[in-house]
Amino acid sequence: MMFRDQVGVLAGWFKGWNECEQTVALLSLLKRVSQTQARFLQLCLEHSLADCAELHVLEREANSPGIINQWQQESKDKVISLLLTHLPLLKPGNLDAKVEYMKLLPKILAHSIEHNQHIEESRQLLSYALIHPATSLEDRSALAMWLNHLEDRTSTSFGGQNRGRSDSVDYGQTHYYHQRQNSDDKLNGWQNSRDSGICINASNWQDKSMGCENGHVPLYSSSSVPTTINTIGTSTSTILSGQAHHSPLKRSVSLTPPMNVPNQPLGHGWMSHEDLRARGPQCLPSDHAPLSPQSSVASSGSGGSEHLEDQTTARNTFQEEGSGMKDVPAWLKSLRLHKYAALFSQMTYEEMMALTECQLEAQNVTKGARHKIVISIQKLKERQNLLKSLERDIIEGGSLRIPLQELHQMILTPIKAYSSPSTTPEARRREPQAPRQPSLMGPESQSPDCKDGAAATGATATPSAGASGGLQPHQLSSCDGELAVAPLPEGDLPGQFTRVMGKVCTQLLVSRPDEENISSYLQLIDKCLIHEAFTETQKKRLLSWKQQVQKLFRSFPRKTLLDISGYRQQRNRGFGQSNSLPTAGSVGGGMGRRNPRQYQIPSRNVPSARLGLLGTSGFVSSNQRNTTATPTIMKQGRQNLWFANPGGSNSMPSRTHSSVQRTRSLPVHTSPQNMLMFQQPEFQLPVTEPDINNRLESLCLSMTEHALGDGVDRTSTI
């Protein structure tokens, strides 16, 4: 995974957290940077906030003891909101203001525990206070006691949830205690005594609450956040474990489905304080309608509810090898439907593809979500037809930007490995013998008025159920034997995808080089190589294409191309951006069909020995090249890169230097008989024939396709 992709994943997690979680995570990451990095970040932040007048006003209020003292006359809801916005702005060393905060915090926490309100907001306040450099060791020790009170109160209120939550708190504290022993020397030395106070305090108050309610420390950790955030070298690990519960209304942060892990992080992104005040009693979990957005396990992202405890033995197809469901959580998240991940986690791929609105209605899915899910599944069913359409567009010379963008989007959708129909009867005979959890979409879960429609849908979905045989990595799909000829069976999405990738490779090899398309294509192949739906044979073929495109890219005469004014005018972006995907502007600009005459063939694609097959009359002599390769003629349509540098080292290759080595899949025809065979009248055109380059491209295209379809075990091409 490239750095750009890693940053994107991290940004996705970050957006799913609330402001407090974001602050804790950033603080834990900053502990790992050097002094120079920390100072640079400080300068950047100070520069960006210099003109923020509103922040300056809040900061003055946050450090004014008189203003803070007046908050005691306000309602508890308003005080909580004020504390959340002002406490982080308290300056270290302002003892008077800190004393006022320490007077308010116990009152707010006591009110929250007594009335079982604002539990989440109270946890956030505790988080800020426990990691704030302005609070002393004694302050943190006193505040840490409230965390246990919050836990006890919530455990009593929520009944069966106390086991998982108390375990998770103990786990976070114990894990932090041991982690701290080895992390003091890894903080790069720029933390001061204020920060070290956090760590000392955390160790002290952890000892007071080290006893586990169940008599042991659980051995699992959060599955929704990166490991580094749960094993940080500061007290933020404890804060995360303390915050990680009682939030059944928040969205799931993780791209993976909720698991039986009580130590899950909060998931509500960019909460406003109005939202914090408005939530109140709604945070209580519901025993009904588990799929509604207000109470679903998936939407909360929390593993501490009784729903997950009841499903400890339930199947989770997201984790089953060859199920085709591993990408469903990410797919649902892209559709903003990830709150229903728990529903899909107990379906097979075939059951998901056969879903109807009636079945979803029986599971209490809202009307808008039902409609969106059904439409999205219908789009999944149309993927193979879309691939066929893309294949035709590529063959006809269409722009590669749009197909590559479509392929990038498609590879992120759920794709299951194709199983031939011959294995389906055996799989079906074995299926009743295997123990299986009842499906959520079974007849018993459907409403009476929907059973007939579901039965009809199931009948129509029977052919697609042939893929239930599981992943067969060594099975050969039809496209591997005859890439460009044999039709693929219905449902062979990986095979169809591979075929389109072959067509794209052909176009990249024979068309004018486009670094953006090449980079996008290589990234796409990397995703295919780690995808479970593709067979080993398909992956070998994809790897071969990747190597060829990489070789083509490495042999790219960059200096020569950068010296061509016409090429620079057509490409507004320079080289060195090979890791970038097509941008919105570039994709929008390439919507029209590509004119083959505008994309000439560079010298590396066809060696000079093969060019000789066309006869000397089809090309310009060296003297003619010297007189015709002028910018004016290039702008008039003769922009063939062969004529870009007359007389130079990158000019049209001679017979003594071939830019492409000979391979066994495409022999070089140098005998007189073969030369006569290729010297047909249609190729013996005058030099002034305007479509000579178009004919050359067609010839190279056919030669490359012949090489790509060389055979089952012969993965080499030109």
Swiss-Prot record:
SMART domains (UniProt xref): SAM
Positions of modified residues (Phosphothreonine): T424
Localization, UniProt: Cytoplasm; Cell projection, Dendrite; Synapse, Synaptosome
Modified residues (Omega-N-methylarginine): R573
Cross-referenced SUPFAM superfamilies: SAM/Pointed domain
Modified residues (Phosphoserine): S168, S420, S580
GO MF annotations in UniProt: mRNA binding; RNA binding; translation repressor activity
Domain SAM: 323-391
Highest taxon above the source species: Eukaryota
A single GO cellular-component term on record: P-body
Similarity comment text for this entry: Belongs to the SMAUG family.
UniProt protein name: Protein Smaug homolog 1
Organism: Homo sapiens
